[in-house]
Amino acid sequence: MINIRPDEISSIIREQIEQYDQDVKIDNIGTVLQVGDGIARVYGLDQVMSGELLEFEDKTIGIALNLENDNVGVVLMGNGRQILEGGSVKSTGQIAQIPVGEAFLGRVVNPLGAPIDGKGDIASTETRLVESMAPGIISRKSVCEPLQTGITSIDAMIPIGRGQRELIIGDRQTGKTSIAVDTIINQKTEDVVCVYVGIGQKASTIAQVVNVLDEKEAMAYTIIVSASANDPATLQYIAPYSGAALAEYFMYNGKATLIVYDDLTKQAMAYRQMSLLLRRPPGREAYPGDVFYLHSRLLERAAKLSDALGGGSMTALPIIETQASDVSAYIPTNVISITDGQIFLSNDLFNSGIRPAINVGISVSRVGSAAQTKAMKQVAGKLKLELAQFAELEAFSQFASDLDEATQKQLARGTRLREILKQPQNSPLSVAQQVALIYAGINGFLDNLAVSDVKKFSASLIQTLASQKSYIDVVGKTNQFTEEAETLLKEAIASTKTGFATL
């Protein structure tokens, strides 16, 4: 027979009564009126905030974007196939935020901060709002430190400073992503945290970027945020903001960060798709009226912080894809007006074998010159002018048959300078190496070399300097092109030249 112990039963009941929670929990619940194309119309959520996260019955999360008289327009962060008409929707009382922290370095995540690289969960205790305010005027400091890309033509003529926004713009397949990836690889010795945001890219393209960064040991200081072409438009729309939130964590902790948005054209397209489905009035090229604000609020988050806030920085390299080199289209002109300069990549230059295919004539850096190293300023001061004059003369020389000697010399030097600025992919150069090559070209040391030998000479000179070390040490320590450095460089050029036939 079972022995019943009343004292035990009464103690359990007493414990249950003590733990009883009398609080009444009120949930704000609505009903799905309509769902499809990544959009849901919800009735009954009168208390919802703009931008608030909503949870559907199948655990899909959505963002309330349109607050109308009789319903709420919600964009879905999943495929929404399990959401049914008449189903319930619960407001969460939260705005979109993602986990952040050091543990994200070396990982590939989606725009919600969830890992997608199969390497397990990411341990994180901190979160940041996906859409947070940009630093104000007092919180900022003017750009004063260089961010070396390792690409000679950029560091010499279109210098980028830490905290700057420099647009990379050009047609498809002109090497835009390559410039951004090379810049990330070049930060290996610079203690810069990098974030690469792939928006609407093919998954294979993002996998290729991850592989290149892995090979070059750059993943150790890089975070990849991926919203590929098969992800919902909502994820493609918030991906850049999520990337900015991850970079901001490091920036506010006093570190230098670099963020690449590849590319903002596809983000604008995703936003246009969402806006049209939400029945917002279309404007120019069917984009909604606030597409300028879409990009300006994102790019304003890049800054060089004041010393009082730790002196961290976020440098942004947004990428824009043009159609048939049309820089005057809506999205390109918007982003050009927001950024502090642009690097324009030309299809014609790319096809003629000049890579990186940078059109120096219409590329500009508005604030970077203040951050350029003194050594580069001393040597590359007249490089842009030389190349501009050369381009003009080259166009003229196609029509003129007999050219005077001075013009022929200028054309010969320009051709050799252009050869020096050609650079293979994934092989960034240090400042000292760049200074050496430009010095050799601009001061006529290559004028009597065959054009076909210039590339080989450049490679040999870099090897010679690497074996001697003294020149690289002088420029590296002082960041100036001193008389001692010039003497050492002249000796290296002379010894390298002995292995080449002169004209």
UniProtKB/Swiss-Prot annotation:
GO terms for molecular function: ADP binding; ATP binding; proton-transporting ATP synthase activity, rotational mechanism. CDD domains: ATP-synt_F1_alpha_C, ATP-synt_F1_alpha_N, F1-ATPase_alpha_CD. It holds the Pfam family ATP-synt_ab. Keywords: ATP synthesis, ATP-binding, CF(1), Chloroplast, Hydrogen ion transport, Ion transport, Membrane, Nucleotide-binding, Plastid, Thylakoid, Translocase, Transport. One of its GO terms (cellular component) is proton-transporting ATP synthase complex. It is found in: Plastid, Chloroplast thylakoid membrane. InterPro entries: ATP_synth_asu-like_sf, ATP_synth_asu_C, ATP_synth_asu_C_sf, ATP_synth_F1_a_nt-bd_dom, ATP_synth_F1_asu, ATPase_a/bsu_AS, ATPase_F1/V1/A1_a/bsu_N, ATPase_F1/V1/A1_a/bsu_N_sf. The keyword Disulfide bond does not apply. It catalyses: ATP + H2O + 4 H(+)(in) = ADP + phosphate + 5 H(+)(out). ATP binds at residues 170-177. Signal peptide: none annotated. The keyword Lipid metabolism does not apply. Its EC number is 7.1.2.2. One of its GO terms (biological process) is proton motive force-driven ATP synthesis. It comes from the Eukaryota. The record marks 363 as: Required for activity. It is a peripheral membrane protein. Belongs to the ATPase alpha/beta chains family. F-type ATPases have 2 components, CF(1) - the catalytic core - and CF(0) - the membrane proton channel. CF(1) has five subunits: alpha(3), beta(3), gamma(1), delta(1), epsilon(1). CF(0) has four main subunits: a, b, b' and c. Produces ATP from ADP in the presence of a proton gradient across the membrane. The alpha chain is a regulatory subunit. This is ATP synthase subunit alpha, chloroplastic. It comes from Thalassiosira pseudonana.
